[in-house]
Amino acid sequence: MKVTFYEDRNFQGRSYDCMSDCADFSSYMSRCHSCRVHSGCWMMYDQPNYMGNQYFFRRGEYADYMSMFGMSNCIRSCRMIPMHRGSYRMRIYERENFMGQMYEMADDCDSIMDRYRMPHCQSCHVMDGHWLMYEQPHYRGRMWYFRPGEYRSFSNMGGMRFMSMRRIMDSWY
């Protein structure tokens, strides 16, 4: 898996090749305005240490990603998303700490309100696979990356309320 970052738009200026997670680009380049994802899927963050807004990038060229995604800040850190082969399973909960209504999911859901009559979820347990969750129905708005693990509360995620979710499939690589 590899991504090349460029200081300027249209793949100009100094570049940095990245083949694993990078918590802070500042030691390699002062800014980043374009990138080429040669292989793999990546989460990009507009703050160091995998903080701030998250953006999903898959194989392709992003000559001016800030305009493309409506970003106000440059990418400052990135995380490689490992390829997952196998089943996908996640439990979503109506309230924090795995309380309230619970639903188990194994496929994409473009609206938890339409499917489960649940306005949003506030905690989840990802058992299998890697997922993207979105603050609005139909995979819109800000997103957050979830890998296997327990997420007891979304309150530390900038007050995000998730209303749709999709699997990161191996066909995206």
Swiss-Prot record:
Region (Connecting peptide): 83-87
Protein's UniProt name: Gamma-crystallin M2
Domain of life: Eukaryota
Family of this protein: Belongs to the beta/gamma-crystallin family.
Cross-referenced SUPFAM superfamilies: gamma-Crystallin-like
Keywords: Eye lens protein, Repeat
Gene Ontology terms, MF aspect: structural constituent of eye lens
Organism: Cyprinus carpio (Common carp)
InterPro entries: Beta/Gamma-Crystallin (IPR050252), Beta/gamma_crystallin (IPR001064), G_crystallin-like (IPR011024)
Subunit structure: Monomer.
BP GO annotations: lens development in camera-type eye; visual perception
Keyword tRNA processing annotated: no
Domain Beta/gamma crystallin 'Greek key' intervals: 1-39, 40-82, 88-128, 129-169
